[in-house]
Regions:
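A short acidic, helix-capping loop that chelates divalent metal ions and anchors anionic groups
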Residues: 4-5, 38-41, 161
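N-terminal active-site segment of His-dependent metallophosphoesterases
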Residues: 1-12
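Short amphipathic alpha-helical segments
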Residues: 9, 42-43, 164-165
Length: 187
């Protein structure tokens, strides 16, 4: 989250945060949090339409093929790698020192699964499918490029709660998307 859950979701706030990210001398990888869009319907956030704020985030913070920052990193975006998921520019991946990194758009505030708005529920299910496809494609890409590890980054605190119970420390765990099971080994 680049803003608190009780501050306004204005274009001005988005512009200020983008300018902040662009001041970093290194590359900046940004994945949206719930405060930036799903919580924007709240009165103290400005009573915005969350889906409109999501569209504004995608337009302002993402450029195909590169990260933010003064020395942007070359990235792959799901929107350009997987035409079926052309709307998901925020899902990014890159290889660094034999480690495959990928961002997933999974946020708090119930991940925008809102029963009071059909459009929000439809957005959730479409984005969830995109995230699953991106995880699977990332592991395929990691295998093809002989990556030694995969790191998945997202902002929601506990989206894989069942995994937390099956993998107790000190262990290293891998998620195999095709079977949706975790494989854990002692660290």
């Amino acid at each position: 989250d680049f803003k608190s859950g009780s501050t306004v979701c204005s274009d001005e706030e988005f512009a200020n945060q983008q300018a902040h990210f662009q001041r970093f001398k290194a590359a900046v990888i940004y994945t949206p949090g719930d405060n930036e869009w799903t919580d924007c319907h709240r009165a103290n956030n400005g009573s915005y339409d969350p889906l409109e704020r999501l569209a504004a985030l995608r337009q302002r913070f993402y450029t195909p093929g590169r990260s933010l920052g003064q020395n942007p990193l070359a990235v792959q975006n799901q929107s350009s790698q997987m035409p079926l998921y052309a709307g998901y520019i925020e899902n990014q991946r890159w290889l660094h020192q034999e480690v495959m990194f990928a961002t997933l758009h999974i946020v708090g505030s119930n991940n925008n699964l809102e029963s009071r708005h059909l459009a929000a529920a439809a957005e959730f299910f479409a984005r969830d499918a995109a995230n699953v496809a991106w995880i699977e494609a990332t592991f395929e890409q990691a295998r093809a490029r002989n990556a030694k590890a995969v790191v998945l980054a997202y902002t929601r605190r506990w989206p894989l709660m069942p995994l937390a119970y099956s993998c107790r420390s000190p262990r290293r765990c891998s998620i195999w998307p095709s079977t949706k099971r975790a494989r854990c080994t002692k660290a």
